[in-house]
Swiss-Prot record:
SUPFAM superfamilies: L21p-like. The lineage of its organism: Bacteria, Pseudomonadati, Bacteroidota, Cytophagia, Cytophagales. NCBIfam families: L21. This protein binds to 23S rRNA in the presence of protein L20. This is Large ribosomal subunit protein bL21. Keywords: Ribonucleoprotein, Ribosomal protein, RNA-binding, rRNA-binding. GO terms for molecular function: rRNA binding; structural constituent of ribosome. Belongs to the bacterial ribosomal protein bL21 family. It comes from Cytophaga hutchinsonii (strain ATCC 33406 / DSM 1761 / CIP 103989 / NBRC 15051 / NCIMB 9469 / D465). The gene is rplU. It comes from the Bacteria.
Length: 102
């Protein structure tokens, strides 16, 4: 059994007892979180497709930790002018354990 759920503007395929990394969510580590925007719910060969979401379906999870992704480096340069600029960015992420698909 799996579900396609929209979290933070992105779509994730989730299954029970699996981890997903999503953009930072509000909430403390160890707290429960519920995602109500379920786009598809699949069980064996039966599919429930929402328009745009499945009515009454939800995905429950537990926030395990807040962390940062690897650094992405951007480099700008203008030729013959001596202008060079380096900028780094680290995306804040949340690790979520999926506990149930309802």
């Amino acid at each position: 059994m799996y579900a396609i759920v929209e979290i933070g503007g992105k779509q994730y395929k989730v299954e029970k007892d699996h981890f997903i990394y999503v953009y930072r969510l509000e909430g403390a580590e160890g707290s429960a979180v519920t995602f109500d925007n379920v786009l598809l719910l699949a069980d064996n060969n039966q599919y429930q497709v929402g328009a745009p979401s499945v009515a009454g379906a939800s995905v429950s999870g537990k926030i395990l930790e807040h962390l940062k992704d690897d650094k992405v480096t951007a480099f700008k340069k203008k030729r013959r002018k001596g202008f060079r600029k380096t900028v780094g960015f680290r995306q804040s992420l949340t690790k979520v354990l999926i506990t149930s698909l309802n």
